[in-house]
């Protein structure tokens, strides 16, 4: 079956019995072949094929944008991260990664994968240059969004260095054809300001009380003292409030019906990210 990849030329899609066979075919970068396991829903099969076309186009244009989200209220930060990921997924190939321990991302987005961020980070540590070939099974899909379920081992998050997160994210974006990667910067990340520093755009949740707002001010003061004035000035602060109580079962579906989501969507122009 010939797949017309437009400006990237014509590629041949090979339907395989096993994921391992598909990955082996995809490692032959010069043969213009796309290996796909045929035992999956049709929309996932099409998504996999299109990813390789996008990968070629994004490599040429250098259009990958990393979006970092930070804040001292974990729940609000995760909601803001998900909202950003959902908005961006409507206009470009988007991946969401939460570096929060016990973030419940897999529960929110109904993950059925047996692999998660722990597996992806393990592959990354084994081979920084080729790890993207071994994390395909860790990438899940929800509507138009791709995501990696949260790590099942807290130490995997606590042990990773900021510069490793940056290399990890850039490697995935470069090799797997994402336009946007949204990073939920969790509490266990050491020196989260360094992760913000490698992002193209940064967001932070506004505080609801005196203590939380003081923590934000102290963080900004520290970053300025460290010469990160430009990052502090570029942070977009968002007040995250849910209009109604939302259960885990319908959180993803109800996100667009909240005021903060609409405000976020009206101020975020993905085409200019």
Task: Give the role of each language-model region.
Residues 251-273:
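NTP-binding/hydrolysis catalytic cores, primarily Walker-type P-loop NTPases
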Residues 1-2, 13-17, 68-70, 97, ...:
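Conserved beta-strand segments of the P-loop GTPase G domain that flank and frequently precede/overlap
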Residues 63-109:
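Walker A/P-loop phosphate-binding motif and the immediately C-terminal alpha-helix
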Residues 91-147:
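Phosphate-binding loop that captures ATP/GTP phosphates
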Residues 8-66:
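Extreme N-terminal, non-catalytic leader segments
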Residues 167-258:
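Conserved catalytic-core segment of NTP-binding enzymes
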Residues 130-139, 149-185:
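Cytosolic-facing regulatory segments adjacent to core modules
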């Amino acid at each position: 079956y010939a797949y017309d990849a437009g400006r990237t030329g014509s590629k041949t899609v090979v339907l395989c019995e096993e994921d391992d066979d598909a990955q082996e075919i995809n490692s032959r970068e010069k043969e213009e072949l796309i290996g796909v396991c045929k035992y999956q829903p049709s929309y996932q099969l099409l998504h996999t094929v299109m990813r390789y076309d996008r990968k070629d186009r994004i490599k040429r244009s250098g259009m990958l944008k990393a979006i970092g989200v930070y804040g001292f209220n974990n729940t609000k930060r995760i909601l803001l991260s998900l909202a950003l990921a959902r908005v961006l997924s409507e206009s470009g190939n988007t991946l969401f990664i939460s570096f929060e321990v016990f973030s419940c991302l897999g529960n929110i987005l109904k993950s059925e994968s047996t692999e998660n961020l722990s597996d992806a980070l393990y592959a990354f540590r084994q081979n920084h240059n080729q790890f993207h070939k071994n994390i395909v099974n860790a990438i899940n899909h929800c509507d138009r969004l791709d995501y990696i379920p949260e790590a099942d081992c807290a130490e995997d998050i606590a042990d990773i260095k900021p510069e490793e997160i940056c290399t990890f994210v850039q490697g995935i974006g470069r090799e797997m054809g994402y336009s946007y990667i949204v990073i939920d910067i969790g509490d266990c990340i050491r020196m989260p300001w360094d992760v913000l520093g490698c992002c193209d755009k940064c967001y932070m949740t506004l505080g609801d009380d005196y203590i939380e707002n003081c923590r934000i001010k102290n963080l900004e003061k520290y970053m300025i003292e460290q010469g990160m004035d430009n990052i502090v000035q570029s942070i977009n602060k968002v007040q995250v409030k849910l209009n109604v109580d939302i259960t885990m079962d319908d959180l993803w579906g109800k996100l667009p019906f909240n005021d903060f989501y609409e405000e976020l969507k009206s101020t975020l122009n993905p085409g200019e990210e």
